[in-house]
Amino acid sequence: MVDQGFFTLKKEKKKNILIKLFYVKILGFCFCDSWSSSDMAHSLTSLAVFQSVIRKEMVRSLHVYESVEIEREFWFKSKSCYVEKKAKPLFRSEDFRRPEISEGSVFGTWRCIFVFRFNHSLPRFPTLLCLSRNPKLEDIPNLANELKFISELKPSKIYEEEQCSSSTEGYYNSDLPKPRKLVLKQDLNCLPDSETESEESVNEKTEHSEFENDKTEQSESDAKTEILKKKKRTPSRHVAELSLEELSKYFDLTIVEASRNLKVGLTVLKKKCREFGIPRWPHRKIKSLDCLIHDLQREAEKQQEKNEAAAMAVAKKQEKLETEKRNIVKRPFMEIGIETKKFRQENFKKRHRASRAKKNQESLVTSSST
């Protein structure tokens, strides 16, 4: 008797729900006083939300409760509360087909931004319809309660049927015998009768592959040791102890050669130069001064035989250049003087003229000999 009473109660509840849904269908927009939006959400089978392409603040929603379809329109005001408006049926017309609804699809001036179907994978909520990000949705409970109901659904409930179907398929497939893979044991390069020859060739191939693997392993180990050697950094104490006097010993060399002799990395040496206020390694300045001094020495030797006064003037120039070189070694941030730059340019022109004259003489000699 208890069971029968229980079933009769269930039937009565179902009848009440159907009656209320019938009233909802007739009224279209308004709900009965006894029927709350939260109760309605539990019977929701699908929901589609559309946004106007022309007016972004206008939003429409199509709610399907078992066999009843309700269409609503909302006004998403930016500066004030959201409002629900009376909606004329637009998506419930005979021309409109429900299966065609998908996220991103456009129907006239309305674009679909959200689609939910029961027993389907949960959709992604846009920021406009996300309750945590958009608290104004609470102003329109008819939409907010249903969005809350969808967000609270667990994926396990929705995927239950899909998982069952996949598991049953897997179970039935496991009973079936797996197809065997065909493997050719015969070497295609040899005749079918010559089994011994094919075995020998296989052995040779395996030995060759093992030898190659050993080679690759050795090369990899060598590369690792080289990397480890390169990665060894100079101790910080050695770098800190480097003074300007030590650096000045190698100013006549290039910066790369100097870093090798000092047993310091190139970047470390450059950093040290910046600390001492050296913007550029003074190798070129000192080299150019050395060349000029060497040229003046030659001139002085020549002038001593002809004219002593000219030789004395050359010697004075030489002394000036030597003092300038010493100053640059002491203070490498110094630039070469204007007079020395002019003298360097003149010296370069002299050399160039001499080399051209020499070439012309050689060409004349060759032409006369022919």
Swiss-Prot record:
GO MF terms, alphabetically ordered: DNA binding; DNA-binding transcription factor activity
Compartment(s) where it occurs, according to its Swiss-Prot or TrEMBL record: Nucleus
Residues in coiled coil: 283-328
Compositionally biased tracts (Basic residues): 349-358
Gene expressing this chain: RKD5
GO annotation, biological process: regulation of DNA-templated transcription
Annotated RWP-RK domain residues: 224-309
Coarse class of the protein's main subcellular location: nucleus
Keyword Transcription regulation assigned: yes
Any matching Pfam family: RWP-RK
Listed Basic and acidic residues bias regions: 202-228
Domain of life from the UniProt record: Eukaryota
Protein source organism: Arabidopsis thaliana (Mouse-ear cress)
Protein name (Swiss-Prot/TrEMBL): Protein RKD5
Keywords: Coiled coil, DNA-binding, Nucleus, Transcription, Transcription regulation
Renumbered residue ranges of the record's region Disordered: 193-232, 347-370
Record bears the keyword 4Fe-4S: no
Record InterPro entries: RKD-like (IPR044607), RWP-RK_dom (IPR003035)
PANTHER family: PROTEIN RKD4, PROTEIN RKD5
A GO cellular-component term linked to this record: nucleus
Function per UniProt: Putative transcription factor.
